[in-house]
Amino acid sequence: MAIFRQLSLGAKAALAAGTVFVSMIVSRSYLAESLEFRAWRCLFRLQLALFVNSLMLLGSIYIWRSTVSNLRHSPAAESACFQLWKMVVAAFLALAHSSFFTMIFLVAEEPYLFSLVAYTCLGAYVIMLCFLCVLSGMEQAYQLLAWRAGRAVGSLDKTRKLALRPALAVMVTTVLSVVGLLNAAQPPAVTTVEVPVHRLPPSMNSLKIVLLSDIHLGPTVGRTKMDMFVRMVNTLEPDVTVIVGDLCDSEASVLRTAVAPLGQLRSRLGTYFVTGNHEYYTSDVSNWFALLMSLNVQPLHNENVRISATGAHREDDDWICLAGVDDIEANILHYTGHGMDLEKALEGCSPDHPTILLAHQPLAAKRALQARPDINLILSGHTHAGQIFPLNVAAYLLNPFFAGLYQVAETTFVYVSPGTAYYGIPMRLGSRAEITQLILQAAP
C-alpha cells in the first residue's frame, strides 16, 4: 500500500487500466459460463467502460495540468474567474469520462440530451488532447533548434507562455468541435461508384447495390436518423441493400423501436446484414439476428445466397454469389458459435459466377483475398474514414484499406464505406458520412 501511495497519478491510472484489463480476461475466460448471461454481459460492458476510462485518465491528467495546474502561480490564480475556469474544466472532463457509461445506462429509442453532451465533450477532449500534445511537441522542437543554434529561446516570460497554451487549445477545440458537429448533423452524402465485375451475367448488368455501414444505433443515434437513412435508401430504388456491421451498440430489446424503420426498406432482391465488432460487444447477437429477420433483413452468418436478376435464391445460370462472414472480433472474443469462417461462407459459390463478400473489417477483407483471390468484390466498413482528426491518422495506419474503392487485382476490388452515421461522438472532421450506391458493370 505504501508503494502504491508513492506512485504518480499517471502510474496509478495505468495500473488501474491494467487491472481492469486482466479482470476482463478473467470474466471472459472463467465467469462467462458460471454467471447468468445477462449479468455477465452487463459486467463485461461495465469492465470495458472502466478500462477505457482508466486510459482516458492519463489524458485528463495532462489536460488538467496544461490548462489549470500550470497556471496556479499566475497573478490571476486567486481570482473568481480562475476558480470558475477550474470548475468548467473539471465538469468538461467528468462529462467526457461519463460518455462510455451512457452506452450502458442511457440508451433508448432516441438519444438522451445528457448522452449527446457527454459524447460531444469526449470529441472535444480528443481534439484538445491532440492539440496540446502537438503544441508541446512544437515548443520542445523549437527550443531544441534554438539551443543548437546558440540563440535565446524567446522573449515571452514563462507565465504568459503557460497562459497562452490553454487559450489557444480552447479556441482551436471550440472551432473544430463546432465544425465537426455541423458536419455530422448533415445527412450522409450519396456516393455512386461503378465497379467492373468479371463474369457478371448480362441480365445483371447495372445491378444496384446500396451499402450501409457503421450506423451505431445507441446513445447518440436513434430512430429519427434511422428513419432518414431508410428514406434515402428507398429513393435510390436499390436492387440489393447490404449492411456491413456495427448497426448497434446495445441490446436488441433496448433498441427494438429505434431499428424498426429497417422494416420499411424496399430492396427488390433483398436486404442483407453481417456482424461488426460492436454487435459482439453487445453480447446479444442471437437476439439481433431474430429481430433483423422479423424486419426482412437477412443475416449472412458465414453463409451465402444466390441472387439472380429476377429474384434471390434462384438456381438458373444468371446469378451472383453474395456471401457474408462474421466479424473477426468474434474469434478474438471466443464468442460461442461465431467467428470468421470464409470456407463455410463461400461453400457453394462457383468460380464461374461472380462472388461478392460482405466483411465488416478491412483486415478481414485482406485475409479473405489472401485465401481466395478469386473473390470479385468485398464490401467493408469499420474505419469511419477516421471520423475525426486525429483518429483519421490512426485508422489509416491500422487498416490495410482505409476508405473508398481499391483495385487489388485485375478482377478484384475492395470498397470500404466511411460509415453511414458515426460512433458515439456526434462529430466528423476530415470525413463525411456516406450512403454508397454501387453499380455493377459487366467486365471482360
From Swiss-Prot:
Co-factor note (free text): Binds 2 divalent metal cations.
Localization per record: Membrane
GO molecular-function terms, A-Z? hydrolase activity; metal ion binding
Q: How does it sit in the membrane?
A: Multi-pass membrane protein
A Gene Ontology term for the protein's cellular component: membrane
Name where it mostly resides. Answer: membrane
Q: Which residues cross the membrane?
A: 7-27, 43-63, 87-107, 114-134, 162-182
Essential cofactor(s) = a divalent metal cation
Q: In the UniProt record, does the keyword Signal occur?
A: no
Q: Which residues participate in a divalent metal cation 2 binding?
A: D246, N277, H382
Is Metal-binding among the key words of this record? yes
* Similarity comment text for this entry: Belongs to the metallophosphoesterase superfamily. LOC643853 family.
Please state what the protein is called: Transmembrane protein with metallophosphoesterase domain
What organism is listed for this UniProt entry? Bos taurus (Bovine)
Q: Which gene encodes it?
A: TMPPE
